[in-house]
Structure formats: C-alpha cells, structure tokens
Amino acid sequence: MGVAAKIGHNRWIASLADEEPALQIETADVSLIGHREENQDRVAIAAAEQAVLLLVIDGMGGHADGARAAETALSTMLEAFWQTPHPIFDPMTFLHLALGKAHEEVVKLGSALSPEARPRATCAVCLVQDSAAYWAHVGDSRVYQLRQSQVLERTRDHSHVEVLLREGLITEAEVHGHPMRNYVECCLGGDAALPEMTISSRHKLKAGDVLLLCTDGLWANLKDQDLGRFAQSQAKPLRDSLNDLGKRAVEASAPYSDNTSAAALRWKAA
C-alpha cells in the first residue's frame, strides 16, 4: 500500500512507505492559482517501485464545486493505483476502469450535495512502467510526449475547437484564441453514463523523453516551441524548469489567467 503526502491544498506526492522507485526518472509538478479566487486544479504523482502514475485534474470553474469534483476524481484514481499490483498487467483496461470509477464518484458527489449540483472536471492521466507510457484523458486536459525539442505526441481534446481543427475549419494556431476554446464535449461528472475517454496504446520511452500533463491554463497560453525548450532544458532540475513554464503561462494571459497546473516526468533509463 502506498502512502500519500499532501504538499499543498491541491498537490499530492505519493510513494511506497519503505521503497524507492526502481525506475530512473525525475518528476515535478506545479499548480498556480493564476488570477482566480480559487485553485480548482488538482495534481498528483504516485511512485511505486515498478510503476508511476501522473494525474492532472481541472475542476470546471463554471460548475458548482469544481474543486471538490477534482479532489474526488484524484483520490479515486490514486486509490485504484495503489490497490492494483505493479507493474499493472493490463494498463489500458486499468486506465479505463479508473476513469470510469472517478466519473461515478463525481456523479455521486453531485447527488449528495444537491439535486442542482453538477460538479465536473477534466482529467489527464499517465501510467509509466516497463520503459513505456500509457495515457488517457477526458476533456481538454492534455498529455504531451516531448523528445528533444519536439512535440512527439499530444492528446486530442474533447472540445468543440478540436472538432473544427480535425475537420480543417481552423488551424492549430487559431485554437488558442478561438472564442469557443473553453467548450468541452465531455468531462468527469457529466450527464453521460460513461464519458468519452481516449486511451492510448503503448508508447515506448527513450532516454531524455519528457511526459507533460497539463490543464488548459498552461497549454492554451504557450506554443509548442515553449514546450520543446522546456523539455530540452536539462541544465537545471525539472522542478525549476516546470515552475518557470507555469509562471510563463500565467504571465502570458495576465490579468485574466486561469488556474495553471502540470505534472512532468523525465525518463532516464529502466
């Protein structure tokens, strides 16, 4: 069983009580309130000996109790990780079941609060084990795989503008400033019995690869070149580089910046 330590009201780091991860990795997280009254994002990194789980959850500020939705989803998925033997036998099924359970618990939260309450959240999650990464997302929280200075992979948002992009009606550059950028098509805690979720297959990791999970408060205010420079900057700790990246995103959208959160992992070797 793992132990979790809360290092901020919305950030968690968890590990086995008497073991250090055998994986050669460097991890970091950041969560900034931006120019909002409350930080409704939640971030967690859970490190077992043979597997690591990264989580970034964005409580939807336009809905009641977004912070509680994010907290509920995070604790549910952390519990699923610690209750599953590592390395996880079927990563894709694990991610599907964990997200489904998180959705169920957020729906239950809304029912317990009041008939009118509909707490919701978007989510990005990544499991790292056996020299590979498996990820999943719901909504517009993203996962990036960065190699050297390039974006090798990124998740595709469940959002209206992503549909427009896929259909060729707008360009990638137009996504960031589009007036409907914040309209998500699905989320944890929504009306569907099970939200649409995208679950990746196995992504092989090479030394130096960086996995970045982030809320829209970060990616919407940075360019791919910014993320590439972040991945390539190995002269200082990943923690410092990620903090700098978060601050840059907040400054880029001041004085209207959103909550801005991310978790990152640099793969060194098995």
PLM features: what roles do these ranges have?
Residues 1-270:
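PP2C/PPM-type serine/threonine phosphatase catalytic domain
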